[in-house]
A protein has these predicted regions:
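Non-catalytic alpha/beta scaffold blocks inside enzyme catalytic domains
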Residues: 119-282, 309-435
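N-terminal, charge-rich interaction modules
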Residues: 7-19, 263, 292-310
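Short, well-ordered coil loops that connect the C-terminus of an alpha-helix to the N-terminus
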Residues: 76, 105, 283-287, 368
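N-terminal export/assembly segments and adjacent metallocofactor-ligating motifs
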Residues: 1-212, 259-260, 432-435
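Short, flexible loop segments at boundaries between secondary-structure elements
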Residues: 282, 286-298, 376-378
């Protein structure tokens, strides 16, 4: 008999939409409403049962034997590395931090490809932010900077940018939506305006807009070479002056962007530039900046680590207390320098040749050390691991909490009954086996 679950939180993208209705038949989700291609791809995907509860050296094993072997490996290691953790609930992430603390390990939240989060701009400048609810209810101008939410976050424009105003006051007939992007994309067709940006011209364009916003009058901005502005940004100075004027005239502006982890320098620089622009903008009116967010619980991993240790990423417990050296104690750097002698990988697949972000040296070292993998299916990394233990699928079979892109915590339901121990339970059992 089909069962319908309502108000279901979807973790397929950073929006964490909490209004889905799922139709469940047995162990399969057969229908997702409201329609969303990203949610449908996540919920309706066929997920075959794992080959066994666990694998040891690629061969089926009992859960007890796998946990015992994993504990032996971690106990014998002098410099273990814990990474992944972004496809896990808050409680599982807390358990991972506790395990890293007990082991004197390094822990670094990464995405499935092994890319670490970049918090340097936040740590340097702070953040000027808000909740998505506040943006949806109060903002009269939304700028999507070099991103395509209609594809990556399909319901973002519907739920945020086109949401009716919910606060009293003399609001305009509708908020204005501007997309700044190198090419026309799915989002530009849904926006009120589309502005041109040269690929790689983010920093130059943001600097120009910031200079104009900071000036008392547009005439106060002195640009010696307007041709150079167009060459570096992909658009004439007049376009950026127009955008700056739009920002100044708005009562409440929200800028959304999507940093790319594949460029270690880019995300931090762009986040810093947008934050500086928003801070300058506050001389005129209210403005906030938010990332669109990533699938799973990436903000949760950073939040949990920060409230447990004071640092959001790349934390080392070897000294008996937490220390962080961003860029030095990231998972990718430690593996590339061959400094880890064991690895615990939680819901990540850094050895997938098609998606990995690790260098060849880092991949080689990861293959040479004993690795323990906790994941919901037999990934490339799990198949090469010393120990692989299979877990329920996060966001479908597990309950708990996850952080949305605006750092609001939302409760998770389980659409399908558990058939395996949760990641949190496995980490606690592993912790109990350590001497």
């Amino acid at each position: 008999m089909p069962e319908t679950l309502t108000d279901y939180v979807c973790t397929a993208c950073g929006c964490l939409c909490d209004d889905h209705a799922l139709t469940v038949e047995g162990r399969r989700i057969t229908r997702v409403e409201p329609p969303c291609p990203v949610a449908a791809a996540f919920f309706l995907k066929e997920r075959p049962a794992p080959p066994a509860a666990a694998l040891i050296d690629g061969k089926p094993a009992t859960l007890e034997a796998a946990l015992a072997r994993a504990a032996e490996i971690l106990q014998a290691a002098s410099a273990p590395l814990v990474f992944g953790c972004e496809q896990a609930s808050v409680d599982a992430q807390r358990a991972a931090v506790a395990l890293a603390d007990r082991l004197g390990a390094t822990i670094d939240p990464t995405d499935a490809a092994g890319r670490s989060q970049n918090h340097a701009a936040l740590q340097t400048l702070g953040a000027v932010t808000s909740t998505l609810g506040e943006v949806a209810g109060r903002s009269d101008l939304i700028v999507y900077w070099n991103c395509d939410p209609a594809v990556t976050h399909p319901r973002h424009i519907e739920r945020i940018a086109r949401h009716p105003f919910t606060t009293p006051g003399d609001h305009p007939a509708a908020r204005r939506v501007i997309v700044v992007a190198p090419n026309r994309n799915a989002s530009t067709t849904l926006a009120d305006e589309a502005l041109t940006l040269r690929a790689g011209g983010d920093l130059a364009a943001l600097a120009v807009v910031r200079a104009i916003v900071a000036a008392e009058k547009p005439a106060d901005v002195k640009i010696d070479n307007e041709d150079q502005v167009e060459r570096l940004t992909g658009a004439p100075l007049a376009q950026w002056a127009y955008l700056a004027q739009r920002l100044k005239l708005a009562r409440y502006t929200a800028i959304f962007y999507a940093p790319d982890r594949s460029d270690p320098a880019g995300p931090n620089a762009i986040a810093q530039s947008i934050t500086e622009l928003v801070r300058d903008h506050h001389r005129h009116t209210r403005a906030v900046a938010l990332t669109l967010g990533e699938p799973g619980n990436a903000p949760g991993a950073a939040q949990v680590l920060a409230w447990q240790t004071g640092f959001p990423s790349a934390v080392n417990f070897a000294a008996g207390f937490p220390q962080s050296l961003p860029g030095e104690s990231t998972a990718a750097t430690i593996l590339e320098r061959a400094e880890a002698d064991a690895a615990l990988i939680i819901a990540a697949d850094p050895l997938d040749a098609a998606t990995t972000s690790l260098s060849a040296a880092a991949q080689t070292h990861l293959r040479q050390i004993p690795a323990i993998v906790l994941d919901d299916h037999a990934t490339s990394t799990a198949q090469q691991a010393a120990v692989a233990i299979f877990t329920p699928t996060f966001g479908i079979e597990t309950t708990g909490e996850a952080f949305r892109c605006d750092n609001v915590v939302l409760p998770l339901q389980a659409a399908i009954p558990l058939r395996l121990p949760t990641t949190e339970e496995l980490l606690h059992r592993l912790l109990a086996l350590l001497n």
